[in-house]
């Protein structure tokens, strides 16, 4: 169980590092955020089943629902940005430009 937790924490850390490294492109950032949410989902589900805390067994499902909503909003933003500007650079998302 300890090696599984370590692998999931490493996956989360690598996805977080990916967000920090590839923050100029929106698509890369969205993929790294999805990796973070997936590793959190698996880690939460494993910890709940390991410690027999079935009173909070709906928490991973709620996290998965919020992750799907985040992915939908992110993809809508990606489509809108790429159709307006022709690329997925995050610099185009400055709302103070006129």
Swiss-Prot record:
Gene that encodes it: MT-ND4L
Subcellular location: Mitochondrion inner membrane
InterPro entries: NADH_UbQ_OxRdtase_chain4L/K, NUOK/Mnh_C1-like
Organism of this sequence: Pseudocheirus peregrinus (Common ring-tailed possum)
Domain of life (superkingdom): Eukaryota
Biological role stated in the UniProt entry: Core subunit of the mitochondrial membrane respiratory chain NADH dehydrogenase (Complex I) which catalyzes electron transfer from NADH through the respiratory chain, using ubiquinone as an electron acceptor. Part of the enzyme membrane arm which is embedded in the lipid bilayer and involved in proton translocation.
Assembly, per entry: Core subunit of respiratory chain NADH dehydrogenase (Complex I) which is composed of 45 different subunits.
GO BP annotations listed: ATP synthesis coupled electron transport
Name under which the protein is recorded: NADH-ubiquinone oxidoreductase chain 4L
Keywords per UniProt: Electron transport, Membrane, Mitochondrion, Mitochondrion inner membrane, NAD, Respiratory chain, Translocase, Transmembrane, Transmembrane helix, Transport, Ubiquinone
């Amino acid at each position: 169980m300890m090696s599984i937790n370590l692998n999931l924490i490493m996956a989360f850390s690598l996805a977080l590092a990916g967000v920090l490294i590839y923050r100029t492109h929106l698509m890369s950032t969205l993929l790294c955020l999805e990796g973070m949410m997936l590793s959190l989902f698996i880690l939460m589900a494993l910890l709940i089943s390991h410690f027999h805390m079935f009173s909070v067994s709906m928490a991973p499902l709620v996290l998965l629902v919020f992750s799907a909503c985040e992915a939908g909003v992110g993809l809508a933003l990606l489509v809108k940005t790429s159709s307006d500007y022709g690329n997925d650079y995050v610099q185009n998302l400055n709302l103070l430009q006129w």
